[in-house]
Amino acid sequence: MNLNATLVAQMVVFFILWWVVAKFIWPPLVKALDERAKKIADGLAAADKGKAELELANKRVEQALTEARTEGAQRIADAEKRAQMTADEIKQNAQAEAARIVAQAKAEAEQQAVRVRESLRDQVAVLAVKGAEQILKREVNAQVHADLLTQLKAEL
């Protein structure tokens, strides 16, 4: 057995195997590894980009929520202010209307009092004329005059 011939034969087989692997197996394997590394790198970049976009979107959402809260609070304050102004206006209108009604009622009461006074004057005048007629129709007598005046007082 020749050790050198075996060694040379093994070296020839090794180099043929190395050449086959280097020519046919290694390039697709390296290409697959490179593609996988590129996909991983692209995935990491996309994840970083997505994370950045998510943070930006979260900031925008937070800003929009803050603006919405501020706008909502402002609208509530404006609505409360308008409601208060409306309530004050209604109150003022009601007070003015009440004052007008009271003034009108006072005027009507005064007119009615004037009418009642005029009516009483007319009645007193009629009674005075009647009393004078009765006094003049009868003879002049103090007792009769006193009785007639008492009778007139009762009628009044």
UniProtKB/Swiss-Prot annotation:
Pfam family, one: ATP-synt_B
Keyword entries, A-Z: ATP synthesis, Cell inner membrane, Cell membrane, CF(0), Hydrogen ion transport, Ion transport, Membrane, Transmembrane, Transmembrane helix, Transport
Transmembrane segments: 7-27
Record's subcellular location: Cell inner membrane
One of the record's GO molecular function terms: proton-transporting ATPase activity, rotational mechanism
Assembly mode: F-type ATPases have 2 components, F(1) - the catalytic core - and F(0) - the membrane proton channel. F(1) has five subunits: alpha(3), beta(3), gamma(1), delta(1), epsilon(1). F(0) has three main subunits: a(1), b(2) and c(10-14). The alpha and beta chains form an alternating ring which encloses part of the gamma chain. F(1) is attached to F(0) by a central stalk formed by the gamma and epsilon chains, while a peripheral stalk is formed by the delta and b chains.
UniProt xrefs under PANTHER family: ATP SYNTHASE SUBUNIT B, ATP SYNTHASE SUBUNIT B', CHLOROPLASTIC
Protein name: ATP synthase subunit b 1
Organism: Ralstonia nicotianae (strain ATCC BAA-1114 / GMI1000)
Gene designation: atpF
